[in-house]
């Protein structure tokens, strides 16, 4: 039986997919603006 690969961890989640990380790069800011344009209630982790 193989182990489950998803081990939830909020700090790691925020550090890899968080808002601050998205704001750091131009591409990240593009992602946020696209999500704003689409009308997402949550922009990032």
From Swiss-Prot:
It comes from the Bacteria. PROSITE patterns: RIBOSOMAL_L34. GO terms for biological process: translation. GO terms for molecular function: structural constituent of ribosome. Gene3D superfamilies: 1.10.287.3980. The keyword Ribonucleoprotein applies. Pfam families: Ribosomal_L34. GO terms for cellular component: ribonucleoprotein complex; ribosome. InterPro entries: Ribosomal_bL34 (IPR000271), Ribosomal_bL34_CS (IPR020939). Keywords: Ribonucleoprotein, Ribosomal protein. Belongs to the bacterial ribosomal protein bL34 family. This is Large ribosomal subunit protein bL34. It comes from Frankia casuarinae (strain DSM 45818 / CECT 9043 / HFP020203 / CcI3).
